[in-house]
Amino acid sequence: MKWKLFYFFTLLTFTPAYFFIEQNQWVILASFLVIVNLISLTVHWKFGLLLISCSAALLAYCQLMPEFQLAKLMKANWLRTPFISWLDQHTSGVFNQYLKLFLINETTKNTLYQSAIQLNIVHLFVISGFHLSFLFGVMERWLYKRFYINKITGFVMLLLYLFLVGFAFSALRVFVSKLLRQMFPKQLPENNLGLTALLIILMSPGALHNFGFNFSFLACFVLFAINKVKLWKPLQAVLTSTLILIVVSPITLHLNRKLNALSVFHNLLFTPIALFYFCASWLLLPLIPWMGNSLVGFYWPLPWLSQWALNTTVFLNLPKPNWVFYLVYYGLWGLLYTVGTVFYYDRSLWCRYWVNSPAVKPTAQPSRL
């Protein structure tokens, strides 16, 4: 069991690093990593040695190359730049903004995006792992399966979409995770997610203080936890949305400085709407050269719905948490998830201490004659 969840435990070690880097708490970050590494040495020297190496690499990357981010380097590439030029040539105004938001993750000067931030549902209106997982799942299920044509086509489409969205971290997570799953089919999902995160961090340490990166991985941990319990589908959807919003609420509060009290309701309401417009926006592309901005009416429900949600919701104005709260909050969640995961994958673990404990021989009862 010690090595079964190796990458998962390694990822949990670095989760709080996001908050320390965000607030430039370098001394605290270094102290935290030293303490964790010393504890890991008591588990196994190889495990501790690798964690120490990862810690040193993390600090060196963040200090020497703070501006190195994969997403920034890939914003202008052979596919994304011509596509943006084509959209700018045939569309303009609000229609242009909606297409860029739903198709290529472009969020600048977009009122719908700003409304989604205030409603704490911004993850639904940008290209995320949710959308790409849906795309890959459709191809894997419905395309021709012989000679792995469905999987090869799915990976090609994911790679093209990565270039199109500028290698957004949430999209990169899906590509790396799916690739690792094909290479190591017996790997535990927690290990797959942990290794995916560590590989992305090595490619771009700036991911540690990127909202999309942290939201994507924290949401996946919640999904893994909920999927281990058999529940009624509607109840599972509500519970999943609730837990995700609870787990990511400190990050949302850090970004927005207020929380939407009706986040769960809005999340359930806008999820099918966002998925519909994600698919429909691609279907509109062939019509754009002939119809142009006249297609903007297709999106008219979105500003109306977002404005209605803003007018009817209740916002909780809370103070911005400090690093102590982040450490305690995510430390407790990490501990709870770790204990639950170990128990789920190795239920006999808790019994071993009882089995290996010193045997107590029952005292002979005096015979009664």
Curated annotation (Swiss-Prot):
Highest taxon in the source lineage: Bacteria
CC terms in the record's Gene Ontology section: plasma membrane
Keywords recorded for this protein, A-Z: Cell membrane, Membrane, Transmembrane, Transmembrane helix
UniProt subcellular location: Cell membrane
Major location (coarse): membrane
InterPro entries assigned to the protein according to its UniProt record, in alphabetical order: ComEC_N, Competence_DNA_uptake
Membrane topology, from the record: Multi-pass membrane protein
Family named by the database record: To B.subtilis ComEC.
Name used for this protein in its record: Uncharacterized protein MG316 homolog
